[in-house]
A protein has these predicted regions:
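Donor nucleotide-activated moiety binding/catalytic core segment of transferases
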Residues: 71-75, 220-255
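Catalytic donor nucleotide-activated moiety binding site of glycosyltransferases and closely related
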Residues: 47-58, 180, 185, 202-234
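Conserved nucleotide-sugar phosphate-binding/catalytic loop shared by glycosyltransferases and other
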Residues: 7, 24-67
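C-terminal amphipathic helix plus adjacent low-complexity
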Residues: 308-362
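A donor-sugar binding/catalytic signature common to diverse glycosyltransferases
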Residues: 87-98, 108-109, 238-279
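A conserved, positively charged/aromatic
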Residues: 106-108, 118-130, 242
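Catalytic binding pocket for nucleotide-activated donors in carbohydrate/polymer assembly enzymes
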Residues: 261-321, 325
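A nucleotide-sugar donor-handling region in carbohydrate enzymes
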Residues: 129-195
Length: 362
């Protein structure tokens, strides 16, 4: 089988990497395509994947419209050359359109439920895989599975934190540190979302340094006052940094979701509603969701300080128990995807007739 996987965000590399390695180990051929947003290329190289880059993403609205035409054409050309049997993506309109043009199936994951994107790819996509938590039904083509995207790469079947990262960070096992994540807010679903004001970012980081070391991962330029806290590890080490943190806080949605699945207390300030983060908050108590207004920023900061004042081992043990419950309730997403793709389209019918079939993949 020849499989083309289109990547639109660094987290999508993680989403598909274990699936790709398993499929390649079975003799299937896999090609990744991508646009360059942040550090997708570094992650693809670190995993040894064959990939084709279509260049930089566009930031302006007009640029995004032009990019749709350009990247559609480049995806179609990649398909014509690679000749995939099936295409996979996280809601990629480019993969969907190219798949339709070459008359091959496109399987899409989705966990953001941005209708402006869904309208562009759903008509050309025969199946959408979405989590079984509460979220808007975006299509009659949905198949819901018991999991989150983050479980495809942070499930204990695939990931064990590397303690060597502590040496790279210059911290001891007993020392508290906070991972802070700031994002560029350039995606289509970020339009109108201004994020955390610079002044509040500086004030919050300064406040956190009174209780723990602070490391900042940022998509863009940091204020001069915060540059000293910039994380200097390699992109592929970010998850290890997160795994040993006492707390994760920031504007990003993906990073707090990863922290929650790892059993690390996570704080999110973002005006975009994240259904899976809300599920992890309401049903497991693993994270805290706030908006970016000043009142919510103060609430988030106070919650951060409250948690950082607690004993490190006690806090870690409490979050581990919460994580264990989450893992017990969900499937091995990668194992499920391997089965689903290898047996498609029969797997689609099986899941339609008997959704509980997925619990074989634990």
């Amino acid at each position: 089988m020849r499989i083309l996987i289109d990547i639109g965000h660094p987290a999508h590399v993680h989403l598909f990497k274990n699936f790709a390695k398993i499929m390649m180990g079975k003799g299937h051929q896999v090609l990744f395509t991508c646009r360059e947003k942040e550090f997708e290329i570094e992650l693809l190289k670190a995993n040894g994947f064959t990939y084709q880059s279509f260049g930089k993403k566009y930031k302006s609205i007009i640029g995004k419209i032009l990019g749709l035409l350009k990247f559609d054409y480049m995806e179609w050309k990649a398909c014509r050359k690679f000749k995939p049997d099936i295409l996979l993506s996280h809601g990629s309109m480019y993969a969907a359109h190219a798949a339709w043009l070459v008359r091959k199936p496109h399987i899409a994951f989705d966990d953001t439920y941005n209708m402006e994107q869904i309208h562009l790819y759903e008509p050309f996509t025969p199946v959408l895989l979405t989590g079984d938590y509460e979220h808007p039904r975006v299509s009659k083509k949905e198949i819901r599975y018991a999991g989150y995207h983050e479980l495809s790469y942070l499930h204990p079947n695939y990931y064990t934190p590397n303690k060597d990262i502590l040496k790279d960070l210059g911290v001891t096992p007993d020392e508290k540190y906070v991972l802070v994540r700031f994002i560029a807010l350039n995606a289509t679903h970020d339009i109108g979302n201004k994020g955390i004001p610079t002044k509040q970012k500086i004030e919050a980081v300064k406040a956190l340094t009174k209780y723990a070391k602070v490391f900042i991962s940022s998509e863009g330029v940091l204020p001069q006052e915060l540059e000293q806290y910039r994380l200097k590890t390699r992109p592929e080490q970010l998850i290890d940094v997160m795994a040993f943190a006492s707390l994760v806080w920031g504007e990003s949605i993906t990073i707090p979701a990863e922290a929650a699945v790892l059993g690390v207390p996570a704080m999110n300030n973002n005006n975009m509603k994240s259904y899976y983060l809300i599920d992890e908050q309401d049903n497991y108590g693993l994270c805290y969701c706030y908006k970016s207004n000043e009142d919510d920023l103060n609430k988030a900061l106070q919650k951060c300080i409250e948690l950082l004042k607690r004993d490190k081992q006690d806090l870690s043990a409490e979050w581990k128990a919460k994580r264990d419950k989450l893992l017990n309730d969900h499937i091995d997403v990668t194992a499920f995807l391997v089965w689903f793709v290898e047996n498609y389209p029969g797997s689609k019918q099986i899941m339609t007739d008997n959704p509980d079939y997925q619990y074989r993949f634990k």
